[in-house]
Regions:
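Lectin-like carbohydrate-binding module/patch detector with strong preference for beta-trefoil
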Residues: 1-171
Length: 171
């Protein structure tokens, strides 16, 4: 699936480029390109089978579909805003608690995560929220915006699942 930020409209995106500072891990950015496979993510959760609903406050991991690395955060500073860096790290065989996110939403009537529903992803280790703003990178990833983790809970922290492969919910 693809995740779009509610404020910027940019897609959560990663490509095989490493940060030049901080962790040096694979960069995660906000992309304006709507048709790239680099914006595809697979949702994983402990004990969750294909077709199981993702419930409010459930712990999930997002795996980058092309590289197999996990959406990750840690205490390194992000390159543009100095907030908390978000990267891609590990592999299907290598994961740690820095890859775990808690899914939240404000609509109390919804029991399960649905397409086009505004959600927040809270990093389990640090309590910060996946975020995107309009600050754009220079070369080599010019035209893409910074993705980071923040303690704020505004529009920069709201994402929605847009296109992707969705399954009927298991009964």
């Amino acid at each position: 699936m693809k995740l779009s930020n509610q404020k910027t409209g940019h897609l959560l995106h990663s490509l095989d480029v490493s940060y030049g500072s901080g962790s040096g891990q694979q960069a995660v950015i906000g992309s304006t390109s709507q048709d790239s496979a680099e914006s595809m993510w697979v949702v994983r959760s402990e004990g969750c089978k294909q077709g199981d609903a993702i419930e409010k406050n459930q712990l999930i991991r997002l795996q980058h579909a092309r590289t197999g690395k996990w959406l990750h955060s840690h205490l390194f500073q992000s390159p543009l805003s100095g907030q908390q860096e978000v990267s891609c790290f590990g592999s299907s065989e290598q994961s740690d608690t820095g890859d775990v996110w808690e899914i939240e939403w404000d609509d109390g009537k919804k029991a399960a995560w649905m397409q086009d529903m505004a959600i927040r992803l809270k990093h389990k280790d640090t309590g910060r929220y996946l975020s995107n703003h309009g600050k754009m990178y220079p070369r080599p990833i010019a035209g893409n915006s910074e993705v980071f983790a923040s303690s704020a809970k505004g529009k920069e922290q709201l994402f929605k699942a847009t296109e992707g492969v969705y399954y009927s919910v298991n009964k």
